[in-house]
């Protein structure tokens, strides 16, 4: 996870925050983060607009002023994402997985639809498999292919899903899913529909479908788009 955070700290974006959520892990996650980023507990008011499991502590980094860490009781991925939304301060938020590594221009490119069209409520980017690639200090330095046949099939499937399926659905405003590994949402819209739900397996797809339903029933103009 430290490598993923380092990749986020190197994003070429003018103003952003990083909120890491430790979902009641029983390993040394918090200890590793404390050591790597010199974290210290910081009492901070946190919105409760979305219900979540109990927040144990909120940490700030003395090395990076835009990095905060939430330590909470276990509640699952959806619950953790809601906790991050509650603490976030900007009108847009980006959700990624703990093992996601973003290219320096990823955030800037994925935010562009919001700048081009004020109706945009969500934007998804392309996710690719890093098996066979080289990652140094949170940065992708060499692109390669894995030797495992199943991993190769997975790469082909990801290319099909993102560069064929989503490219076709996006112009029709019919995107049914934005990958939980990399997606940007308008916070107001997500909070209005109740955030992520913990009682479903595919919380990323369920949220997108719920946004479609809410905005269509309300006859509100909106866009949910994909950036290749």
Predicted regions and their residues:
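Conserved short acidic donor-positioning loop in nucleotide-sugar-dependent glycosyltransferases
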Residues: 8, 23-24, 75
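Short, well-formed alpha-helical segments that are part of the catalytic scaffolds
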Residues: 1-10, 31, 79
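Acidic donor-binding/catalytic loop of UDP-sugar-dependent glycosyltransferases
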Residues: 28, 32, 98-113
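A conserved acidic beta->alpha catalytic loop
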Residues: 22-42
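Long helical/loop segments within the catalytic core of UDP-sugar-dependent glycosyltransferases
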Residues: 42-82, 86, 90, 104-201, ...
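Short aromatic/hydrophobic "clamp" motif used to bind/position activated sugar donors
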Residues: 93
């Amino acid at each position: 996870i430290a490598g993923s955070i380092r990749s986020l700290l190197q994003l070429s974006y003018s103003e952003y925050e990083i909120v890491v959520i430790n979902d009641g892990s029983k390993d040394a996650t918090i200890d590793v983060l404390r050591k790597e980023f010199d974290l210290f507990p910081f009492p901070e008011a946190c919105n409760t607009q979305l219900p979540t499991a109990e927040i144990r502590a909120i940490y700030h980094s003395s090395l990076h002023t835009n990095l905060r860490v939430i330590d909470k009781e276990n509640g699952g991925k959806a619950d953790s994402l809601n906790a991050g939304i509650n603490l976030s301060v900007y009108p847009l938020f980006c959700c990624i997985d703990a093992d996601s590594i973003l290219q320096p221009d990823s955030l800037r490119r994925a935010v562009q639809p919001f700048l081009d069209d004020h109706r945009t409520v969500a934007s998804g980017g392309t996710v690719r498999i890093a098996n066979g690639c080289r990652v140094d200090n949170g940065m992708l330095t060499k692109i390669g292919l894995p030797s495992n046949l199943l991993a190769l099939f997975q790469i082909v499937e990801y290319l099909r899903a993102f560069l064929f399926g989503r490219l076709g659905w996006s112009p029709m405003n019919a995107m049914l899913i934005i990958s939980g590994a990399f997606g940007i949402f308008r916070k107001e819209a997500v909070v209005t529909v109740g955030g992520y739900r913990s009682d479903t397996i595919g919380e990323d797809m369920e949220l997108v479908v719920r946004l479609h339903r809410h905005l269509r029933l309300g006859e509100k103009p909106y866009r949910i788009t994909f950036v290749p």
